[in-house]
């Protein structure tokens, strides 16, 4: 059956979260400190569920395991990607993620390379993107001394910015920023620094200094260089094409016909409204929708005014 898979997904409370997932997208959030919406996920810590069509009610991990034909008969043992929206009402911890080899050996799951599309950012908002240490020994010394002002590289951000964050990159999302994150399907994070804050039980969150030093990369991160193409009714920006995923921004105005060029596509509507037509069937689209266009869909048409982030795995 050639139909898009619309998804219902899980919210995650975070010490740094807020309520902008409700304000911006109208989502039903569980608390005023909701930090993450795992919009397209088959990770066991937050599995999305199909909410329409033949597979209504089926969890995405189960669908991937039992109907691999929907995903181009992908050879990846697990659904390889995870799409999130993050609301940073405060700084996230300064952190780093391992690569596949380290994560599989030590954590039993994929590594975590990710990327961020900035949906909104307060005036003066910043991220941490890299560090100033010239060696692992200097890195260890600066962490031990708590010399964060000299170690951490801060840069200002605004809505529409994009950052590629390979495994091994020291990073943190700053206060007042909302992002859409495309990442490998992993929940492994090593915290380097958490601003000495305490949770609602008065406890500090665990740090992972030795693991962080093991996996951190020395040298400045190299951000992706987006490529832009305009056709009638469609502006396409290839935000990044990496060994793990390719991510696009589609700005749609009017009617646009498209072809499936990947085994399947992950689609997130960040703004606007419209519809997608597959064969003879039409499906409404609105801001905050997340869906998968499976391999059974070879072509479709978008109508309306829509801002979309789409992605596909490159590990199929």
UniProtKB/Swiss-Prot annotation:
Its cofactor is Zn(2+). Pfam families: MPI_cupin_dom, PMI_typeI_cat. It comes from the Bacteria. One of its GO terms (biological process) is carbohydrate metabolic process. GO terms for molecular function: mannose-6-phosphate isomerase activity; zinc ion binding. Binds 1 zinc ion per subunit. Its EC number is 5.3.1.8. The active site is at 191. Zn(2+) binds at residues 95, 97, 114, 171. It catalyses: D-mannose 6-phosphate = D-fructose 6-phosphate. Keywords: Isomerase, Metal-binding, Zinc. Belongs to the mannose-6-phosphate isomerase type 1 family. PANTHER family: FRUCTOKINASE, TRANSCRIPTIONAL REPRESSOR MPRA. This is Mannose-6-phosphate isomerase. The gene is pmi.
